[in-house]
Amino acid sequence: YNLASKDNKWNGKYYIHKSFTEEYKDKDISVGVNTNYNTKNISFRMSGLYVGDNFNSELGYIKRTGIIKINPNFKYKFWPENKKIQTHSLEVTPVFIWRPELNNELSDRFLIARWGANQNNSSTMGAVVKNRFTHLYRDFDPTRTNGVPLPVGSEYNFTNFEAYYSSPYSEDFSYTLTPSFGEFFNGKIKSIDLRLSYRIQPRFNSSIQISYDKINLPNPYPNANILLIAPR
C-alpha cells in the first residue's frame, strides 16, 4: 500500500509478504512500514520491519531473518542568509534490532547524530557521531584476518566520529574525503576514505575509491591495516 497526501507532506509504503514452502508452515511472513513527513524545515520518518525466521524471498536478497527492526529519523533544516551555505541541518537516527525467537533480546542498536551543510557551489560537508551496541551470536574476527575471534555471547558498546567533505559535483573532477576515528568493538580504529571522480562529457566517466583502516585490538586479538582500492 502506498500513501501520498495531496500536499505531498505525507507519504509512505506498507507491505506484508508471505513465502510458501513445503518445509515451513509458520514464521514465514515479512511486514514493513514506512511513513514520512516533510516540510521546508522539518522531516521525520517512522519505519520498521519484521522478518520471520522462515521467510524466504524468491525475488530478492534478505540480509537477516528472525528480527524486529525500527529505525525512525528526525531532521531539522536551517535556511541561513549566507553567501556560502545554502542549507544546513541536524539529524538524529536511532536503530534498534530485536530477536523474537530469543525472548525479544536486543541484538543491535545504533544511535546516529549528524550535522550536514549544502553550500551554494554544490559542495557538501558534515560531521557524524555514531554509537553502536552489538551482541555476538557467533565467534567473530572484526579484522577479517583469521586471528583470534571475539567470543560468542560477548557484547560491545562503542562510539566513533566522522567528518566528510564533497567538492562541487558540477565540476569535471570531484572528490569526497571522509576521515573517521574512535572505538571499534573492544579496541580502536582510524579510517580514511577517498573517492575521486573524473568525467569528459558526454564520452567518459570514471571513479576510484581508496579506503584505509588501521585497527588496534587488545591482546590476544589481532591488529590490522586494511587498504582497499576499487576502480569503477
Give the location of each predicted region:
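Exposed, low-structure sequence patches enriched in small/polar residues
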Residues: 7-232
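Hydrophobic, small-residue-rich alpha-helical packing segments that form membrane-like cores
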Residues: 2-6
